[in-house]
Amino acid sequence: MAAPEKMTFPEKPSHKKYRAALKKEKRKKRRQELARLRDSGLSQKEEEEDTFIEEQQLEEEKLLERERQRLHEEWLLREQKAQEEFRIKKEKEEAAKKRQEEQERKLKEQWEEQQRKEREEEEQKRQEKKEKEEALQKMLDQAENELENGTTWQNPEPPVDFRVMEKDRANCPFYSKTGACRFGDRCSRKHNFPTSSPTLLIKSMFTTFGMEQCRRDDYDPDASLEYSEEETYQQFLDFYEDVLPEFKNVGKVIQFKVSCNLEPHLRGNVYVQYQSEEECQAALSLFNGRWYAGRQLQCEFCPVTRWKMAICGLFEIQQCPRGKHCNFLHVFRNPNNEFWEANRDIYLSPDRTGSSFGKNSERRERMGHHDDYYSRLRGRRNPSPDHSYKRNGESERKSSRHRGKKSHKRTSKSRERHNSRSRGRNRDRSRDRSRGRGSRSRSRSRSRRSRRSRSQSSSRSRSRGRRRSGNRDRTVQSPKSK
């Protein structure tokens, strides 16, 4: 038989183990409780987060709705403004269209009115023409009837109040001054062709190679190298000696000028002024149609009598700004300055003729303008000629010497004063002042010498005249003494 099993009872744990198991159980429960609390907190937090997210979404939706509403209102405002602008633009277009239609209607009415007037005028002209033709035909029939009847016939007399009025035009200044105009017959101004004049014009009588080639200067600049001004002037001298005696054979020539302009209407023109119109007419009848240098001369009367107005004064001093395009006369200088009186229009002033004017003009040519000016000033300061003329020239010479000494003293004193003032100045200024003072003193000495020479010559002429008069008196008185 088997031995009976021995019953075993669990051993009672010790107090230490019991307490450890109890603490373990407590920690487990605490962990379970913390897990339950954690699970419940997470769910609450998630719920709070969900509610917060929902609130945010609602707020965003509200904001979006408000923004959508604001944009819609702005769009409505813009649409209203655009509709208003479109309405105003439409009204303006309609108003402009109405105005244009009104203008077109007025223009059409004006055009129709003008067409109607033109038709009426044409009809009236046609009627007048028809009436004139009928009247003319009637007159012709009447004239034919009169001729058939054997009576004399003539053109009808014009009405008493009928006048042919020429359009009033201004005179051409260039033709009046130079006798030629660059427009010729196409000029819009009036050319008064003289029927008689003391001046004869021969167009293009003087020709040279240089004057013929002047038209080619624009296309051939080297053409001017084939001739010179000296050659042209020498040809003018030959021409002058060749033709002037022929003109002088007709009458007295008081002016002879040859134009050296390059303009076609002035090129080579020859101007000859006679003392009388009869001599000029004789020259015209003699030279017109004659041949010279292979060309037939075309002579005509020229209105030029004042050469100061015709001749370009700036060309004589080589300062003419227009050059070859100048419309005033550029003339060759006559040899020995012949006919210089006519250049100054001396023959036109009757009170300035005679030998006295010739002497004064020669003296004016010899003397400079500066000396002439100062001599005129001193002449004004001189006393009257009744008191200045003495029995002999001694007193005048003494007075002139006395004035010369006084002027010399004045100049010496002024020099001393000037030197005393200019000592403290620099050398450049003193040199410039001394040069100016020297030029003034030289001009004064020249005027003084000319005045002395004139006074001495006048005193000598007066003394000679008195001696001659005394001799005449003696010869007249000698028969009486006998």
From Swiss-Prot:
Keyword Zinc-finger attached: yes
PROSITE patterns registered for this protein in UniProt: RRM (PS50102), ZF_C3H1 (PS50103)
Modified residues (Phosphoserine): 349, 384
Cross-link (Glycyl lysine isopeptide (Lys-Gly) (interchain with G-Cter in SUMO2)): 45, 62
Pfam families to which the protein is assigned, alphabetical: RRM_1, zf-CCCH
Compositional bias ranges of the Basic and acidic residues kind: 360-375, 383-398, 413-435
Disulfide cysteine pairs (residue numbers): none
InterPro entries according to UniProt: Nucleotide-bd_a/b_plait_sf (IPR012677), RBD_domain_sf (IPR035979), RRM_dom (IPR000504), RRM_dom_euk (IPR003954), U2AF_small (IPR009145), Znf_CCCH (IPR000571)
Zinc finger (C3H1-type): 166-194, 306-333
Subcellular location: Nucleus
Post-translational modification: Phosphorylated in the RS domain by SRPK1.
GO cellular component: nucleoplasm; spliceosomal complex; U12-type spliceosomal complex; U2AF complex
Distribution of this protein across tissues and organs: Widely expressed.
GO biological process: mRNA splicing, via spliceosome; RNA splicing; spliceosomal complex assembly
GO molecular function: identical protein binding; pre-mRNA 3'-splice site binding; zinc ion binding
SUPFAM superfamilies: RNA-binding domain, RBD (SSF54928)
Composition bias type Basic residues, residue spans: 14-31, 399-412, 436-454
Domain of life per record: Eukaryota
Signal peptide: none
Record region (Disordered): 1-59, 115-135, 351-482
Keywords: Ciliopathy, Isopeptide bond, Metal-binding, mRNA processing, mRNA splicing, Nucleus, Phosphoprotein, Repeat, Ribonucleoprotein, RNA-binding, Spliceosome, Ubl conjugation, Zinc, Zinc-finger
Domain RRM: from-to ranges: 198-304
Function noted in UniProt: Pre-mRNA-binding protein required for splicing of both U2- and U12-type introns. Selectively interacts with the 3'-splice site of U2- and U12-type pre-mRNAs and promotes different steps in U2 and U12 intron splicing. Recruited to U12 pre-mRNAs in an ATP-dependent manner and is required for assembly of the pre-spliceosome, a precursor to other spliceosomal complexes. For U2-type introns, it is selectively and specifically required for the second step of splicing.
Assembly and oligomerization: Component of the U11/U12 snRNPs that are part of the U12-type spliceosome. Interacts (via RS domain) with SRSF1 and SRSF2. Interacts with U2AF2/U2AF65.
Protein name: U2 small nuclear ribonucleoprotein auxiliary factor 35 kDa subunit-related protein 2
Biological source species: Homo sapiens
